[in-house]
Amino acid sequence: MTSTARSQELDYLKGVLILLMIAFHLVYFEHLHPYAKQVVYTFHMPAFLLVSGYLVNVAKTWRQFLITMMWIAVPYAIMESAYTIAASMLPVSDHVDNLTPALLLDKVLLNPLGPYWYLHTMVICGLIAKAAHSLPVGNTLRLLAMVIVMVVVSQSPLTLSLPCAMYYLAGHALRTTGQPFTLFFPSTLLAVLPFAVLAFFPTNLDKATPGGAVMVYLSVCSLLAACRLSGNRLRQLFSFLGRRSLLLYVFSPVFTLSAKVLVPFLAFDPTGFLFLVLSLLLAVCGSLGIGYVLDRLHISPWVFGKNTL
């Protein structure tokens, strides 16, 4: 399979995963489907971290690599600051009492609040991967060094979920072997059946358990099979969203919060799926709209390091 085809499959995978993330950040919908939320939370962010670890390019020079990390850190810092300030004023589950400049810095630098922890984790793990790559040893020892540093960091004041870091490491380890992502994760719908069996037992609904790890693997295989079987237009749509997953990740929380205003008008649907569809449209179109405005105002290079989003 060509690198272009593999890239489209990874973009498709990211597109599906970002929609799942948005869907289960809708408080109304997740409360209606708590078990589905548990199942999705078992695999969607671990799968994202696997892909991120696989795609990180540690062969760049330190200068090039730090620039790449900076353009993840800048939108993260802006939105994490905004989220923390909003959480100090709004009656949300992550409400912050007595916000001070020191507490704000703590949330941005050490202990992220809300949905932006993934970007924080990406920067930390990316820097660890690059530092390990710089060691004058073989790949096995570099990966071992990454494990040690990740364990140490996870025990420090700097928030880093060790299970999440291990999924990033797994993706990076796969990349160092030179094995194609789609060879290690074969696209097969046969993965759906064992996934469903594992999901039936609540003890497996934890990414840090062996059952949870197998569910992550099977979910990726299943989604890659869905990519292969999708029509061209649907595949292009999800790939389009996958290429803009950072934009959607950064701005969608604004719209998942705003979607609450739809609840009274859609309460007649006991499943919440109408609310889900309309909220996803709002979040996706709204986020892409913000990206368009940032492009037109020439702000994108200052926030994302790109002329167009």
Regions found by a protein language model. Give the residues of each.
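Alpha-helical transmembrane segments and their immediate juxtamembrane cytosolic regions
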Residues: 1-309
